[in-house]
Amino acid sequence: ACHFRIMTDNPKAFIGLPEVNLGIIPGWGGVQRLPRVLGKSKALELILFSKRLTSAEALACGLVDKVVPAADLLAEATAFAQSLTKRPPLAVAAVLEGMSVGLDKGFDEGLKLDEAWTAKLAASKDAMEGMTAFLEKREPNFIGE
């Protein structure tokens, strides 16, 4: 599982879950994770029929977030990752944990966690830095505290 997915537009590149063709099911939680990304009907279609998708099809159904030329794939993924590292680490952690808990354990559990994170983040150095940087019209320098 991954939070973001970038795929090449190479016509030989496909994505799919072929395990049912072998008489087994997708490993590593594929049966549980795919419907959370695509919805039940599309996930069933891809898994039960071992359908392979081109990059355009994967993008259209939401399985990948972005399609780029093969020559740009590593640079694009690196730039994306570097951009993410500039985000406030505590807030990013809060969003990732809150979304996972909300999806896995339910809306109410997710809200409880959001409430706890909101209090923690409001008192953080990163929140102060973010607000100060905004008022001073400069880029923030987050430190994860």
Where are these regions (language model features)?
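Short, structured loop/turn "capping" segments at alpha-beta junctions
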Residues: 41-44, 53-60, 88-93
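CoA-thioester-processing core
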Residues: 1-47, 61, 76, 80
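C-terminal long alpha-helix characteristic of the crotonase
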Residues: 6-13, 64-112, 119-125, 141-145
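Short acidic-aromatic low-complexity motifs
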Residues: 49-52, 125-129
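Hydrophobic alpha-helical segments typical of transmembrane helices
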Residues: 30-33, 42, 91-94, 114-117, ...
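Well-ordered beta-strand positions
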Residues: 4-6, 45-51, 57, 66, ...
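K/E-rich alpha-helical interaction surfaces of small helical-bundle regulatory domains
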Residues: 129-144
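Terminal peptide-recognition signature
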Residues: 34, 58, 95, 134
